[in-house]
Structure formats: C-alpha cells, structure tokens
Amino acid sequence: MTSPARPLSILHVVRQFLPNRGGLEDVVANLAREQARLGHRVRVVTLDRLFSKPEVRLPARERLEGIDIERIPFSGSHRYPLAPSVFRHLGDADLVHVHAVDFFFDALAWARPFHRRPMVATTHGGFFHTNAHSRLKALWFSGPTRVSVRAYEGIVACSESDARMFAPITPAGVTVIPNGVDLDKFAGAASAAPRRALLTIGRFSHNKRLDRLLSAMRALGPGWRLRIVGVPSDVTVAALAAEIDRLGLTDAVTLHVGLDVPAVRELIGQSSLFVSASEYEGFGLALIEALSAGLVPVAHPNDAFAWLKERHPLISLCDFADPASAAGAIRDAYARLAEGRLDPGAASLPGAEDLSEYRWPRVAARYVALYEAALAGTGAGTGLRPSTSR
C-alpha cells in the first residue's frame, strides 16, 4: 500500500485506551499505528483514569507504543462518563474518529455546528452488551442516538449484526468493516499436542458470562483445565476467585490478570481449545486471535459469533446456558482434534483458516478510503471549510 498524497491529521476519541488492555483498546491502537505508518498524523484522546484503577490518574500527555495520547478528566458513571474538555483537544484535526456510543459520540455530534469537524464513528457494539437497563437503553437508542448519528459522515459497524442494529436509525446507511486483528501476535502458538486445556481471553465483565463458563467446567469433571486471561471490568478478581472456590474448581481453573503478549502466548502454548460463553460481542476479536493461534474455538451463539461461524467452519457453537450441553460440545471438539477427525479441508484445520481480511493494512486502507469520502463530502478534502449541513 502506498502512502497518501495528502497526509491527514486524524484524531481518535475513545473512553479507554493504553495502558489498559481489551478489544476496544487494541483495535484503536492498531488502527492508529497503521495509519501513522502510512504517513498520517494521528492522536488519541481518552479519559485520564482507567475504569479498573479509578484511583490512579494517568499523565495528561504520553507517547506509548508510538502513539501520541492526550488524556482528559471525567465525572459521572463509567457507562456514560462526562468529559466536556474533549472540545479543547480537537486542534488541527482534519477528521475526528469516535469509537463506541457514549458521551463522546453524543457530545461531538450535538456540538457539530460549532466545531465543524468531519466525523466518522465505529459503533463497537453500541451499548447493548448486557440486558441491564434494557428499556432505558432502547429509549436512548431510538431518541438521542438516532439524532446523533446524523452528525457523522460515516457510521461503521464491526459486524453484520451490529450493522442490522444501527441501520434503522442511520438514514445514510452503515458501512461494515470487520475489526482488524494482529494475526502475527499469537500465530501458531497453540499446543502442538492435543491437551484437555481451555483458554478464554477478555474483560472480566457480566456480558462475558464467566459464571456459565465455570459451570461448564464443573460439568466437564476431572482432567480438564481452564485458564481465564483478562482484566477486571464490572466483575472483580475477588468475585471470580470466590466463585471458583465455591464450585470447587481451584485446582482446575486459574486467573491470569493483566498479562503482556509474551505471557499470553505462553499460556496459549499450553492450551488446545478457546472457549467463550459471552452473551454479547460487538465483533469477536479474541476468537479471531484464537483461530490465528491454532486453537479450536467453542463459543456461545451470540450474533457476532454466529456471523463468524458462517465464515470460519472450525468454530463450534453451543448454548452455555446449559452446562451439560456446553461440556458435551467441548468434549466433542477435543475428541475431533485428538482423534484427527477434523475435516482435512484447508478451512477446517487449526491454524489453516483464511484470516487475511482481518489484516490491519487491509482494514486501515478501508478506513482511510472512508475518511477521504467524508472529507470530500464536507468540502474539507478540497481545502474548503466543512459545512454544517448534511
């Protein structure tokens, strides 16, 4: 891919970022790095405290992993953090890219007539990750969110299920760009010999349904191991440890918090299957990483995982609400692997799936094309000041 004729000044706005680790943070970090590699000037504005460590205030400005980060204070709930000083950080941005649907999404949209910056947004699943406050969320989605989307030149969904959710409130249409994935990070790291060892990676949050995963582990019985890798969110390490102890799984299940990439890769090397009981995913980044590692995935059939299953037949889906059924699916996936009963076709062997569409150069190119269209649509791409009309 060649560098752009006119480098852009791109501002990413996201509520949580490095040094925090998670799917959203990884997506923004990788996209920012790839755009910088292409010659663009890239900044990230984020909140100055991690939700997992609210007592620690991070530096106002920092450069991490080659990315310029500006952090701002906030108040209110983690679900809708209020951070009005974001407007002081727009600077010379040619385009603002908002990630997720929260205060930033609404505030920058409603203030569009004043800041007049072209904007695109990636939904990352919106705010429907759990059923909590579902009626209020539905009302907000059909009201303020419906109004806010009109301020954006482009709305991007990470999956077809996400696109279906936002299409009814987005008159200009929704563009589907699957998240990019660092396919080299864990490439081929899975155990060469089949093991009754399971791995799950992700935030410790209610929508991940780690409680159901633990119930499936108890149903599996002796001889199985589960490694839970991630960072605390709305489920604490103490709560998880207590549940593991209550179920009598302390010898079978271990928690691994805040690991770096080499440490996670080492755990993958001791595992054969990836498992997820998640009820909701905006995309399913960890599952794609698992496929790249050569792990065999067994996952709950949420919309995002069902969409990925259509593309990647190695994935097994089962209802983790039924521990016995989930345990049976895990045993069957392991047996197919151990006995060599996996389809020998190239698309159905661990590590052999075609994942090229998720490579970051391809994904970044699609986003830059969207940016150029957004700038052209506002007149900014021709050096004119952006119009406030749509």
Locate each region found by the language model.
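Glycosyltransferase donor-sugar binding loop
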Residues: 48-51, 201, 225-241
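Membrane-proximal helix-turn-helix segments that form the acceptor-binding/catalytic region
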Residues: 138-154
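Short alpha-helical donor nucleotide-sugar binding micro-motif in glycosyltransferases
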Residues: 258-259, 266-271
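Conserved acidic donor-binding segment of nucleotide-sugar-dependent glycosyltransferases
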Residues: 311, 315-324, 332-338
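Conserved donor-binding/catalytic core segment of Leloir-type glycosyltransferases
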Residues: 11, 190-218, 227
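Nucleotide-activated donor-binding/catalytic signature segment of Leloir-type glycosyltransferases, i.e.
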Residues: 68, 238-259
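Carbohydrate-associated surface elements
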Residues: 161, 180
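Aromatic "clamp/platform" in nucleotide-sugar-dependent glycosyltransferases that forms part
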Residues: 279
